[in-house]
Amino acid sequence: MITNSLDPVISIGTLAKKVGLSVSAIRKYEEQGLLISHRTYSGHRLFSYEDIERVRSIQHLIKELGFNFEGIRRMQAILPCWDLLPCEKKVQENCLAYNGTSKPCWMIKEAHCTLKGNECRKCLVYRFGSLLTEDIKDLIHKERYETDQRSRIKQLLNET
């Protein structure tokens, strides 16, 4: 039987063993908004194979790069979800995820995409946000640089 990497098939205990953490540490990651579990009807947490890499990435940020939970959350909060999941300008202006800097979009229950019924566990922003956090600076710098360059070129063309 082949399973999708997003299918919730791993118990919290199995996940903890695979990544070398305690069950309480996995719960703490979830409590801090760094990990989203799937809940069964009986309330048991299940995780996907992708969550194994997500937890390993979080461990790397904490142990090797010296981040704390708040630092990781704030870094994930600046992920440009509006570029990955384009939404209308009017929606962006009123979106708490777009305007906020302290929580990633999947922690904001009033985010526009959540209200539309999107499941954060399966969302591109959440799925790759944890894995890309080390490259956020490059992503944002490149975007800003290209935007500044385009603006500067337009300005120069208008002056001639």
Where in the sequence are the language-model features?
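Alpha-helical residues within the helix-turn-helix
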Residues: 17, 30-31
